[in-house]
């Protein structure tokens, strides 16, 4: 008899579950994980090598435990791009925004506590909640994937969650959440508990609108999380961060592992922040390609959700997984997120997007013959 997971004394709530993960397939065009398709510029690669070489001289020592220089530069980046003044006391960094979320749930969630998100949304919120023993509540959305504010506030009032997740732009739909919606949910959360409200802005640099960082003023229970994986084109770096009241930054340090950010990670992230202007030019190119995908998909005859991210949700399909397979058979990998009738495609290079559009045109024609 084969020994497997079910034979181990794992927690009951983990039994029968599957780990998070998008398919990793060797195909000509991969547009399924919302990566930035542009390699880092050579000048940045050289600067990373210089900074890592400097850091390597001290690898016999532990890194800066609190990543003060990195947090200072992240605060400067947020201030410069949002107009909202922040300093090192407002920023915390970790190994990807998923670790940021994990630390928040370890601090404010956990056994006997709950978190709510409005689905479909970023699935890792619920998965990390489960991993930290936090009860998960799925909140409502309208059919157009916008948040149903009256229903959402009723859900918050009924369940009185300890943590509220709001993703804007939302993943996988791409829809942005207006500031007034965030404020309404924040007020509902404070009246019910009070609760921590986490605004996940992983894709905000691609948005038509502005960051919600200015909402931090006077709202100590509000947190904005970010990542360097998307706009900075550094998915392989694994660097996420949050902005919040200094008390929140102090609180998450109660659960962070010692020396959690390696010296190499800190050095690489600092090098990337030195090249912000160059990297954000790629963001503008991707926004143009994103808008082209929206227009072309609609012209082909697909329904498309309004997108403020670097990806587009399109449909409607009688069998979305079968359509995903037909696109894959043409050498293009997109994402089936499990949203019935819909698929998601990442904005790639113009050449990658052309290949994708050719594939879906063929699929559309095949489905109508």
Curated annotation (Swiss-Prot):
One biological process term from GO is: L-histidine biosynthetic process
Spans annotated as Disordered: 1-27
Query: Which EC numbers does the record give?
Result: 2.6.1.9
Tell me the residues on which N6-(pyridoxal phosphate)lysine occurs.
230
**UniProt keyword terms in alphabetical order:** Amino-acid biosynthesis, Aminotransferase, Histidine biosynthesis, Pyridoxal phosphate, Transferase
The answer on whether this UniProt entry bears the keyword Amino-acid biosynthesis reads yes
Q: Name the Pfam families for this protein.
A: Aminotran_1_2
The entry assigns this protein to a family as follows:
Belongs to the class-II pyridoxal-phosphate-dependent aminotransferase family. Histidinol-phosphate aminotransferase subfamily.
Would you tell me the protein name for this molecule? Histidinol-phosphate aminotransferase
Gene that this polypeptide is encoded by: hisC
């Amino acid at each position: 008899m084969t020994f497997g997971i079910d034979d181990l004394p794992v927690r009951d709530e983990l039994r029968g579950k599957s780990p998070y993960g998008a398919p990793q397939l060797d195909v000509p065009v991969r547009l399924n994980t919302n990566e930035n398709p542009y390699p880092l510029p050579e000048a940045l690669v050289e600067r990373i090598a210089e900074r890592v070489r400097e850091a390597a001289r001290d690898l016999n020592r532990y890194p800066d435990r609190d990543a003060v220089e990195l947090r200072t530069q992240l605060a400067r980046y947020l201030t410069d791009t949002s107009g909202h003044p922040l300093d090192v006391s407002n920023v915390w960094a970790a190994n990807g925004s998923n670790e940021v979320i994990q630390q928040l749930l370890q601090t404010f969630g956990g056994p006997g506590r709950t978190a709510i998100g409005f689905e479909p949304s970023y699935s890792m919120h619920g998965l990390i909640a489960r991993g930290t023993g936090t009860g998960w509540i799925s909140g409502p959305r309208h059919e157009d994937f916008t948040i149903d504010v009256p229903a959402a506030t009723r859900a918050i009032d009924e369940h009185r969650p300890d943590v509220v997740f709001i993703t804007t732009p939302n993943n996988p739909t791409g829809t942005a959440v207006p500031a007034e919606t965030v404020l309404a949910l924040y007020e509902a959360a404070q009246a019910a508990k009070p609760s921590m409200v986490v605004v996940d802005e992983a894709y905000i640099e691609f948005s038509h609108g502005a960051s919600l960082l200015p909402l931090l003023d006077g709202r100590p229970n509000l947190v904005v999380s970010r990542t360097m994986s998307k706009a900075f084109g550094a998915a392989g770096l694994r660097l996420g961060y949050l902005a919040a009241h200094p008390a929140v930054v102090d609180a998450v340090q109660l659960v962070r592992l010692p020396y959690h950010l390696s010296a190499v990670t800190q050095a690489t992230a600092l090098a990337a922040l030195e090249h912000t202007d160059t990297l954000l030019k790629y963001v503008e190119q991707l926004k143009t390609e994103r808008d082209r995908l929206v227009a072309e998909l609609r012209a082909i005859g697909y329904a498309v959700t309004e997108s403020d991210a670097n990806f587009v949700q399109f449909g409607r399909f009688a069998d979305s997984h079968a359509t995903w397979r037909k696109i894959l058979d043409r050498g293009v990998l997109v994402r089936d997120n499990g949203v019935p009738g819909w698929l998601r495609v990442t904005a790639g290079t113009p050449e990658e997007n052309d290949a994708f559009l050719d594939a879906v045109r063929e699929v559309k024609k095949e489905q109508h013959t």
